[in-house]
Amino acid sequence: METSSKMADQTFLPFVSRPGRYLGSEFNLPEIDILAEVKWALVFPDLYEIGMSHQGLQILYQILNDLDSVAAERCYCPAPDAEAIMRSRGIGLATLESATPLKDYDLLGITLPHELCYTNILTILDLAGLDFRAANRAESAPIIIGGGTCGFNPEPIAELFDAILIGDGEEAVTELSYLVASLKKKRLKRSAIVSELAKVEGVYLPHRYSPSYDTEGKILSLEVIKAGPPTVKRRVLADLNRIDHLYKPLVPNARIVHDRLAVEVARGCTRGCRFCQAGITYRPVRERSVEQVIELAEQGIGHSGFDEISLLSLSTGDYSCLPEVLPELMQRFANEKVSVAMPSMRVGTLTRELMDQIRRVRKTGFTLAPEAGSERLRQTINKGISEADLLQTAEQAYRLGWNLIKLYFMIGLPTETETDIEAIAELVDKTAQAGSVGGGGRKKISVSVGTFVPKPHTPFQWEQQLTIEQSRARLSLLRSKLKKKSITLKYHDPEQSYLEGVFSRGDRRLLPLLIKAWENGARLDSWSEHFNLRRWLESAAQIGVDLDFYLRQRDENEILPWSHIDPMVEPEFLVAERNKSRSLEYTPDCRYHSCQKCGLCDFKTIQPIVHNKKQSPPAKQIINKEPVEEDTVEHHHHYLVSYSRTGTICFLGHLEFLQIIQRALPRANLKPHFSQGFNPSPKISFGPALPVGTMSSCEFFSVDLQQPLTDLNHAKTILDAALPDGLSIIEISPLTGKLVQDMICTYRIELPHDLSEAELETISGLDSIDSMVVERIRKGRRKSLDIRPLINNIRVSAARTIILELISKSAMPGTKPAEALATLLHLDEETVLKLQIMKISWSELEN
C-alpha cells in the first residue's frame, strides 16, 4: 500500500474520531538526523493514548536519537475507523514525525507489551505493505525486531519477526544500531545482516529454531539450526543509573492514559510472588540513586510542565530511598502544586508518613493488592502480607482523609477453593469497616478482580487456567457477597483472560489462528468495545485449533514452547518454588535476607543494587519537610493573553487546549496562582470553547500570576516558545475588570464547492427565516433547540466563502458554525466535514 498523503492533514483528520491521535508535534521532540546512517521506526501496537503512556518506548526513542548517525521516529496503531479510511484511500502507515512510510526504514522496533495486542501487529504490518511472515519479506523490507514483556514467550508470533530482543533494551539498541550501520557499509544482503544480529547479547533469531510435535500436540523436540545457541539468554541492564535520557520527556498534546512525568526509581522485584512473571524477568532489584531521581524529576517537570510525578517500580514502596526521596520531592514541588503518585504500593510499605507526604498537594490514588482473600492462599502465592497489615493501612488512609481505597484480587490461583472466594468478600467487608473511623464523608472501596493467567518462567507456569465458565461462576459468587452500596466490584472480562491464557503459553501453531482471526475482523482485543470472542472461536474452528489445549496443566518434564528462552533464573528454582507453594513455605526477599539461589546473580556484573540495605523500607524515619514559602502574602497579577491557533493542532478538543496552556505557563516560568482544596488547579480562565477543527486568529485567556511581568514582550516571546506548533501568542496585556464571556464571534467559512443559486438565495433571505430547530442528544435524551436567534448575520465573501456571525452567551446553549451553516443550507455530512472554518474576530455583546 503506497502512501498517497500524510495522515495528519485536513483531508484525513476531520473524518476520524479523536484526531489528536494522529497529529504528533509533541513538545520536546528531539532533533532528528535526517541523514542518519541507521533509521528506526519504533512501533507501539496499540492506540496512541496507550503507546504514549509506555515508558519503555520513550526511553528507547531518546537513547536512539541521542546517538550519532542514528535516527528514530514513532508509529502507533490506528483505530478501526482510521484504518478503514486509510484502506479506502490507499494511505500507507507512516511515522508521526516525518510521515515516512514504515517500509522505508532500516529497522522496525515493535514493542510486545501484552498478548491481546497481537492482531494490532498484523494491522500495522499490513498497512505498511509488509508480508506477515519474516521468511517471505522482500530484500528491501526493513528488519523487524520485537521486544518487551511478551518476548519471554514470543513463539505464537515468532515467525512475524526477523529478531526478538529478550530482556532490557537500553544498551542493546545502541549495539544493534552500530552493528547495522557497519554491516550496511559492507553492502551485505538482508538475510546476512539478520544473522549477524545474534552477536548482540539477548537477540533471538526465530528462524534458527524449529519445533516438532508428538501425536498429543505436545512439543517433541526443538531443533536448533544454523549453529544457533541452544538457549538465548536475556539481556540485563546491570545498573539503572546508566540510563538518564528522559530529562526532556515528550509532552503529548492529545490526552493519554498516563498523562504525567514518570520516573523509574527501581527495576526488578524479589518479593517472590509465585504468579508474577515480572518478578522473574526483571530481577535483580536495581535501584536508582536519590540524586538521579531528584535530577530526573526536576529536569522533567521543568521541561514538561506536568503537574504530577509518578514514581515507577514494580513495588515503589520497596524502594529503599523512598523515605529520603519523597519529602525532598514534596519540598521542591509542593508550592508549584506538583503532586507525587505511587501507583504500585505493597501492603505494609504504605505508611502513615508516606501518606502524609502524598496528600500535601492532592490525594493521588493508590491500589493495594492483597491478591488473595485468605491467609492460606496468600501463603501459597508467597504474598507475605497479613490481614492485619491491610486493615491497618486502610484505617490510616481513611484517617488521613482518603475516601476511596482500591483493592485488587485474583481468582483461579492454584489450590483456590470456594472458601477462598468468600474470604475475599470478608476481607473487603473488614476494610469497609475500617472506614468507620474519622470523618470526611462516606468511605468507598473499589474492588478489581482478574482471572489468574499462568505465565511462562514462573513457579506457576505449569498450572491449569480456569475456563470461562469457572471464572464466571466464581465472580458470580463474589458478586453475591459484595452488595454494600459503598463497595464497587469491577472485573476483567473472563473471555479476554481466556484468550490471553491461550497466547501466553502458546506455540507457533497459533500464528495461523492469529492471521485468520485478523482476517475475520479481530482488532484491538484488549479494548472491551472491540473484543469479540466468537470471532476467535469461529476462526479456531475454521483452522482446527483446540484453544483449551493451551490452558491445560503441564508436566514439569514437558518441553515448553519457551524452554529455549533463558530468563537466567534456573528452572530448578521455579520447581522448588512450586513445591514450596504446596507446603505453604515462605521464601524471603533476597534484598534483605540471604541469597535464595535463583541462579541469576554472578555478583560481579549482575547483582542487586539497593542503596539502604540495613533495614527494609520504609522503616527508616521520614523527615517531614514543609515547602519553603516564598511570601506569606499573596500578590495577584491578572493578564489577558491573546493567541492564534492554526493548522492541524485545531483538531484537538477544548480540554486538551486547556491542558496545553496549563503546561506551557510553568515551562515559560510564568507561575499562576492555584485554587484551594483537595485538587488545586491553576487560576486560568478561557473564552468560549472552539469546536474541534476550527482555527482562530483571535483566541484569549486570562491568568492570575504570582509575580508581575516587567517586560510584556519578553513574556510573550518565552511563552510563545513554550507552545507547540500551531499556537502563537499575539499579545499579553494587563487585565482590568472581568473576562468577556458574552460576545458576537465572526467566522470565515470555506466550502468545498462554489455556492449554488439556491444556497445564495437562502443566505440572502436569512431575515425571513423565523426558526431553525436542531435536535441534540444529551445523556440519552433528545432535546430540541432553535438556533436561529444565535445567528446574528451571514454574508457571502467569495464564490465559496461565507462570513458568519454567531452569538455566544455563557449562560445559554450555543451553536457551532458548522451546525448553523449545515442547518441553514441543508449540507450533507461529508460536506460539513470538509468545511474549513476560521474565527477571525469577536466583539463584546451589548446587553
How would you name each of these model-derived features?
Residues 255-291, 597-610:
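Canonical Radical SAM [4Fe-4S] cluster-binding loop centered on the CxxxCxxC motif
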Residues 633-636, 657-659, 768-847:
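Core RNA-modification/binding signature centered on pseudouridine synthases
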Residues 42-44, 299-406, 410-449, 454:
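Conserved SAM/AdoMet-binding glycine-rich loop
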Residues 2-29, 36, 40-42, 484-630:
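Radical SAM enzyme core and accessory elements
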Residues 11-41, 48-49, 206, 212-262, ...:
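N-terminal [4Fe-4S]-dependent radical SAM core
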Residues 42-46, 64, 251-275, 301, ...:
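N-terminal pre-triad scaffold of radical SAM enzymes
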